[in-house]
């Protein structure tokens, strides 16, 4: 086809471009605003409250620790998107998941300083999908338990390389070589540029916060000094690289030597002899909010369901009081669940258990106290039996649980006024009590 000659087509083209420019200048904010309507801002702390864009944020969310693992392979990656979409439809704002897998199958960190790019891209996918669905992520950085490597794997690496001081798992906290391993991992992770979004993790507001370690215990030093020293060092190191994100420890919430008057709140005596100390650990200067777990099934041996419910209320109110008076920081209950393996278990008990916990948070939020929200342990989708435990739930298969989750989202949204600004909240909450 011959190239056009003369000025014939030029005037119509210029007219078209002029029209486009006029539309853009006149209505561009409205048109392109649709693309940025769901953009997330960094979550910050104002005293005992989380805030986003100057408004309080109360968290209603869940745990799906398995996201990165399932995002590695094509055949299972869709589960991440499906769970995030389902969470968003329930109005859930935060999902807690693992940003670690040390050694073993689908390891992110194969050995100290060696990373599998394939698995890193899986984590990139998780973060990008969360952003797409408007859900923030609480990313945990290492496990106290052996699952997915944890501190045991770090100790084994040091031992295998002939630099370990001890074969004890607790040497993770005091061995200089292991501390260097962990700091190197932190540096690589925090400065990772997402292959899908082009944003470094430390600059991505999709990440709600970092969790230093899941359920830390250091039973070789019940004074708590060893764990406290490690927390202080590692949190300062993280903040030197990333001062934009919030940071929490990842505690279960057990009281230690620094709170002698609170020891009776612990489930049993053993809980004060784990080397962790809720108030002292959470009061570390670089910790932005406290984290607490709720597992009466694991913590008591002979109590019935009604006794467990009473404990839950006492446990939560005690920690909220700490947030208000001692720490002056938000308190987020980052795991809670009721086992379906109890000998007297009935599905209706789970409804009451969830309702009790949600009511405590709702009342705290109404009074602008430090109870900042909850994360259910754990949500799955169909076909994940191998990842289920006695706490796992496919929420849309249990209508009563799904209704409770949506109701809590709406209640918390109304307190902050966010339902007046967000179309999703308006639609979801318009017929809710």
Swiss-Prot record:
GO function terms (MF aspect): mannan endo-1,4-beta-mannosidase activity
Cysteine pairs bridged by disulfides in the record: none
Signal peptide: 1-28
Statement: the UniProt record of this protein carries the keyword Hydrolase: yes
Catalytic site: 215, 335
Name this polypeptide is given: Mannan endo-1,4-beta-mannosidase 2
Protein family according to the UniProt entry: Belongs to the glycosyl hydrolase 5 (cellulase A) family.
Cellular compartments annotated: Secreted
Binding of substrate, residues: 98, 214, 295, 377
UniProt enzyme class: hydrolase
Top-level taxonomic group: Eukaryota
Expressed in which tissues: Expressed in roots, stems, leaves and seeds.
Keyword Lyase: no
PANTHER family: MANNAN ENDO-1,4-BETA-MANNOSIDASE 2 (PTHR31451:SF45), PTHR31451
Reaction catalysis annotation: Random hydrolysis of (1->4)-beta-D-mannosidic linkages in mannans, galactomannans and glucomannans
Gene3D superfamilies in the cross-refs: Glycosidases
GO cellular component, one term: extracellular region
Record keywords: Glycoprotein, Glycosidase, Hydrolase, Secreted, Signal
Protein source organism: Arabidopsis thaliana (Mouse-ear cress)
Residues the record marks as carrying a glycan: 46, 169
A Pfam family per the record: Cellulase
Annotated GO biological process: mannan metabolic process; polysaccharide catabolic process
EC number(s) given by UniProt: 3.2.1.78
């Amino acid at each position: 086809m011959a190239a056009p000659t003369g000025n014939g087509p030029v005037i119509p083209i210029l007219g078209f471009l002029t029209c486009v420019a006029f539309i853009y200048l006149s209505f561009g904010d409205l048109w392109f605003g649709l693309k940025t309507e769901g953009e997330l801002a960094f979550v910050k702390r104002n005293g005992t409250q989380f805030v986003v864009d100057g408004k309080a944020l109360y968290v209603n969310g869940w745990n799906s620790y398995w996201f990165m693992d399932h995002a590695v392979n094509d055949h299972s990656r869709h589960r991440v998107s499906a769970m995030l979409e389902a969470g968003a439809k329930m109005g859930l704002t935060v999902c807690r998941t693992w940003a670690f897998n040390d050694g073993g199958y689908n390891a992110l960190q194969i050995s100290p300083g060696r990373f599998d790019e394939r698995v890193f891209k899986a984590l990139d996918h998780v973060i990008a999908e969360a952003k797409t669905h408007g859900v923030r992520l609480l990313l945990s950085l290492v496990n106290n338990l052996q699952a997915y490597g944890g501190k045991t794997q770090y100790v084994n690496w040091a031992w295998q390389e002939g630099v370990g001081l001890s074969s004890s798992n607790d040497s993770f906290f005091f061995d200089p070589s292991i501390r260097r391993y962990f700091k190197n991992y932190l540096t690589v992770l925090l400065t990772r540029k997402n292959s899908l979004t082009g944003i470094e993790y430390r600059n991505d507001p999709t990440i709600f916060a970092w969790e230093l370690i899941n359920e830390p215990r250091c039973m070789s030093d019940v004074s708590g000094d060893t764990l406290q020293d490690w927390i202080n060092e590692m949190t300062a190191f993280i903040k030197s690289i990333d001062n934009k994100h919030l940071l929490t420890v990842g505690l279960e919430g057990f009281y230690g030597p620094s709170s002698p008057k609170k020891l009776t709140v612990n489930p049993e005596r053993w809980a004060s002899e784990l080397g962790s100390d809720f108030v002292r650990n959470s009061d570390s200067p670089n910790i932005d909010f406290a984290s607490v777990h709720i597992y009466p099934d694991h913590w008591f041996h002979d109590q019935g369901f009604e006794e467990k419910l009473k404990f839950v209320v006492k446990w939560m109110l005690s920690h909220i009081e700490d947030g208000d008076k001692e720490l002056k920081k938000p308190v987020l209950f980052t795991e809670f669940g009721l086992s379906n393996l109890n000998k007297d278990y009935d599905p209706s008990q789970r409804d009451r258990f969830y309702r009790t916990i949600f009511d405590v948070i709702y009342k705290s939020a109404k009074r602008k106290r430090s109870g900042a929200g909850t994360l259910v342990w754990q949500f799955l989708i169909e076909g994940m039996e191998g990842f289920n435990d006695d706490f796992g739930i496919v929420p849309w298969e249990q209508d009563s649980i799904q209704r409770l989750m949506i109701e809590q989202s709406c209640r918390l949204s109304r307190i902050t006024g966010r339902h007046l600004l967000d179309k999703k909240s308006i639609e979801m909450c318009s017929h809710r009590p």
